[in-house]
Amino acid sequence: MARYTKAKCRLCRREGEKLFIKGDRCFTDKCSYERRPYAPGIAGRMRKKMSDYAIQLREKQKVRRMYGVLEGQFRSYFKRADGMKGVTGANLLMLLETRLDNTVYRLGFANSRAQARQLVKHGIFTKNGRRVNVPSMHVKPGDVIEVREESRKIPVIAEAQEVIARRGCPEWLEADGANFKGEVKAMPTREDIQFPINEQLIVELYSK
């Protein structure tokens, strides 16, 4: 499956804001976007006025890259969100938030979504007692995500309590770093997603 393999900080610079792709590094002065807050390339400093379509496209790319989802997957999520009851944009964000890799990241067991995806693929987590290794798997209220006993000495996992204390945990999740597990308490709401996203632009883009 194709994945973006170049410097991830370039993606933040391309979108003109932090996407927090590299986890804790994004909160330090080592963040590339902090040092060079303009698009990569020779003409990066000269941002042109964008058309409505370009603005919609950039918003879609921003969200897709933030969650580390491929274009085909993202379009599939939109179609699914559009067929659900409620507001399509909010439904889309809920589907992205309840991916297993994002849940692992939100619980503090990884420094970034990319790292969470890798850890899930290595099969170090269980969901309701069963080993899982599919990052795109969705979680629901009542699900318990736990680190397998033999994987608890992995440095990033061992530091989970510290990460949770520093970063916090969204209200729809309950993290128990001391016991290397977390529980899904409810489905995430739009208010649970603090990152500045204008999902209506994405809806308008796919509605053309």
From Swiss-Prot:
This is Small ribosomal subunit protein uS4. The keyword Ribonucleoprotein applies. Residues 98-161 form the S4 RNA-binding domain. CDD domains: S4 (cd00165). Pfam families: Ribosomal_S4, S4. It comes from the Bacteria. Part of the 30S ribosomal subunit. Contacts protein S5. The interaction surface between S4 and S5 is involved in control of translational fidelity.
